[in-house]
Amino acid sequence: FPLGIAFLYFWSLYGGWSIVADGLGADSQQQHHYLYWKVFPVELNEEYLWTLLLYALFVLVIELTLLAVVRSDRPHMDQAAEALWISHTVLLVIAALAAGTSFLIVKDQLATAVLLGKSGYSVTRGGLGEMVPLFTLHQVLNRVALFSLAIGIGVWFTGRQGRWLAGNATLVTGAGYSVLLGGMFLYVTALGNKNELFSALILGGFFHLANTRRVKWGFVGAGAGMMFMGIGLVDFLRAFPLIDLWEGGAWWDAIQWVPEIHASNEAFGAHLSLYGALYFHSPLTYGSSLTALLFSVVPRILWPERPGDIYSHYASSVGIVEGVGEQGFSIHHATGWYLNFGLPGLLFGAVLWGWIWGRCFNAYLCAEATRDRGGRWRYAFAVMAPWGFVAYIPPLIRAGLEGYKGLVI
């Protein structure tokens, strides 16, 4: 819960400190001002005051809902209970197939990026004038591959002694995880997909802590440090042309930049969205996200004019040009609900968020008690639910209510 609340604070309110400080004449040392001419300038006016108040209200309602939903009577956990046995081979095959299919979707765009001297991040996100067909499926497959590796590696290091899930940790499967993880790191570096890598780190790390009977903090710290460095590298290298990554010169610059990752503008893109909606008086859509969510089961390649999500409405209402391929602007989850149903929608969205999060944790607490009644799949879902939800907070907080589709998948 503390990490999840920290995520909410970071993407909701943290960026406000720098904006207010700079607006009052101080120097926050944050390099976010370029967003003002790419999106819109921010003034310390009434709209920005309401932006901060509504974000704070959104986070507070989530916390209060959690307090109301999470069980206070925790069932007894039998430490000697037998864990559910999983197959590392199956997880490796799933990860390999998902990664391979994802690559097939974007291989032509990556080849074009090499020829034109562009970054993979740019060309796969509209830098060539249009989005990649099946881009959403590509993103889902990326997460499937990384999450399968995260779960598998977490279980591999607990071996046969896992509390919830266990498996036969052989050198062959360990080598398979190493090769696939290295390949996926190079792949997401070429794509610039740092958020998927970050979510996988959270899922694998927290599930390992929950699953192991004896925490090796030195190992956990070393693993977290290496992954943090990897995320920093991806964040820096995502803007480089693919040919520069191949030649290798950019990697040393990226390693030197990693300690400066705190200066990333990650906290500002979504934070600005509610201010934009209030300042430009963006009209409410009264449920367009529900329509978009319903019709999203049809791939856009089959229905090019499929109703757009709430970000498209937000972007058009504040004057952001979509598909420019240079900047991954996003919308805050609270803004998505606000643009659908106003203040009641924002409050309902916060309650729904807290209720789902609390139910995920309750399912984990009751996993052992319901194992015989629910079957293997329900048990596996229960023991993974809270860690999976927290791992998905970074992408969910930067999406409208349509983001729940990705959570379910």
Question: Which role does the model predict for each range below?
Answer:
Residues 1-22, 164-177, 370-386:
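Membrane-interfacial loop-to-transmembrane alpha-helix junctions, especially the N-terminal start
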Residues 1-92, 96, 204-209, 214-222, ...:
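N-terminal "leader" segments that precede or initiate the main folded domain
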Residues 35-37, 68-220, 226-244:
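Membrane-embedded catalytic interface detector for glycan/lipid assembly enzymes
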Residues 37-51, 121-142, 253-260, 336-339:
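Short aromatic-rich membrane-water interface segments that cap or initiate transmembrane helices
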Residues 53-62, 89-101, 138-152, 335, ...:
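Hydrophobic alpha-helical transmembrane segments
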Residues 99-112, 219-309:
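Aromatic-rich transmembrane-lumenal/periplasmic boundary elements in polytopic membrane proteins
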Residues 113, 117-125, 288, 292-334:
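Interfacial juxtamembrane loops and adjacent helix segments
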Residues 326-409:
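Hydrophobic alpha-helical segments
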